[in-house]
Amino acid sequence: IGEGWHRKAGEPHAEVNAIHSVKDKSLLPKATIYVSLEPCSHHGKTPPCCDLIIKHKIPNVVVGTVDPNSIVAGTGIKRLIENGITVTVGILEDECNELNKRFFTFHNKKRPYIILKWAESLDGFIAPLTKEKQEPVWISNSISRQLVHKWRSEEQAILVGTQTVIDDNPKLDVRDWKGENPIRIVLDRTGKITNDFHVMNKKAKTILITAQENLTFSENIIAESVIFDIQLTKKIADISYKYGIQSVIIEGGRQTLQSFIEANLWDEARVFIGAVSFNDGVKAPVINGIPKIVKLKEDQLKLYNNHD
């Protein structure tokens, strides 16, 4: 009789949208509402979802997973039961955990869900030794590249190191797909990245992580000063958490990607193997595990999961 989903932080939750989508509200007192995540019971950016369920006298609520957010964490279920509503918990729990993996990682591990992504040649390089232009050298095919833009639209932030910006001058935006541009997180220890690089434009917010202090930029650029040491990956995760970033896709370069692998600070890795060879160049990161392999025409996509 109705359905809904949570479109954006600060906007109505899935339960609210689902209830409002029902044209004949007289059906609600004999309905069942199915939710992937426990309905909230607190006043945050939006009113409690529990209040609306109770108001419309919906008698049955089926919950996929309990909300790990300490503000909720079972209080929503308790509130519904106290108001005479039958609550069933744990239906399709694995599927709901997968659906909400970014949210759960953010609240349980106090860091974003981290996805590593790169493309490498058949002989294991992510870039040739030299190139003529300050732009990416394409390794993967057009289908693979479109998929990358879809991924960018699904994550809250995208991260690259200094050398990737200097070598490729990437836009780090969403093209070839519909969606919002992710927040750009850029590592720039010594201040090599100037305002004429694409990552410094106003098409998206940029968080610049640097060892420099007292830097001033335009309003869309935030500078975070840290010491670049062995704890850098943890500091990046902490800064992302500080700004409420629930997911990050890391697109390079080799040193940046390898540092997250060696710190075991990643959740997924998505590796394209393109149908090209360089014979020499920048070696691809080294990652262990048994991937799932997907064919994308002449490309291969290797998918790794780093489960606890």
What are these regions (language model features)?
Residues 13, 73, 98-99, 194-196, ...:
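Short, charged, surface-exposed secondary-structure boundary motifs
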Residues 256, 260-268:
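Short acidic amphipathic segments
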Residues 105, 111-247, 255-258:
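Active-site ligand-binding patch in enzyme domains
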Residues 1-2, 128:
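A structural microfeature
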Residues 59-67, 184-189, 206-213, 268-276:
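Short internal beta-strands
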Residues 280-308:
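Conserved histidine-centered catalytic loops in small-molecule metabolism enzymes
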Residues 2-95, 259:
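Zn2+-dependent cytidine deaminase-like catalytic core
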